Amino acid sequence: MHHRFTPPMMSCKDTAIQLLSRRDHGQYELRQKLTVKGYASQDIESAMHFCLEHGYLDDLRYAKSQIRQHVGKGHGERRIRQELSLKQVSDSVVENAFAEEPQDWFELAKSVAMKKFNGVKAKEQKEYAKQVRFLQYRGFSFEQIRYALSDEA
């Protein structure tokens, strides 16, 4: 008979550090993960305070990382802002992150459109509407979409 070795449960702080060593997390996201793992709220707050104090947890760094990741996926500013809002990153942190990670949203919209539609301009209104919807879903503004789908783009 084999007995499975079960390691002692890690402390909340150690779990938080382990999660943060893999990738950046926002405060809300880390708190949620620790709660799901069953740690007491007092232990979670203590671990969060430790991680903030030692620079392991930083919402600005997390937001900038998320911006870079979403831009790499071809997402526009609106979609990225919505995702960060869902992760409960504060508006001021989001504004600072966008200021520190400048993007040319018009050119990004154009390159996403080129990749998706192979540079083919819509000949019919129905096809044009389909292209617009795709870019709207990706989080681009109408001005950016118009630029991306225009002939001078």
UniProtKB/Swiss-Prot annotation:
Lineage of the organism: Bacteria, Pseudomonadati, Pseudomonadota, Gammaproteobacteria, Vibrionales
Pfam families, from UniProt? RecX_HTH1, RecX_HTH2, RecX_HTH3
Cellular component terms per the entry's GO annotation: cytoplasm
Question: Per the record's keyword annotation, is Cytoplasm included, yes or no?
Answer: yes
User: So what does this one do?
Assistant: Modulates RecA activity.
Please state where this protein is localized: Cytoplasm
Give the record's keywords alphabetically: Cytoplasm
In terms of Gene3D superfamilies, this protein maps to: Winged helix-like DNA-binding domain superfamily/Winged helix DNA-binding domain (1.10.10.10)
Q: Which family does it belong to?
A: Belongs to the RecX family.
Q: What is the originating organism of this protein?
A: Vibrio vulnificus (strain CMCP6)
For this entry, list what GO says about its biological process.
regulation of DNA repair
Q: Which gene encodes it?
A: recX
Query: InterPro entries given for it?
Result: RecX_HTH_1st, RecX_HTH_2nd, RecX_HTH_3rd, Regulatory_RecX, WH-like_DNA-bd_sf
What is the protein name given in its UniProt record?
A: Regulatory protein RecX
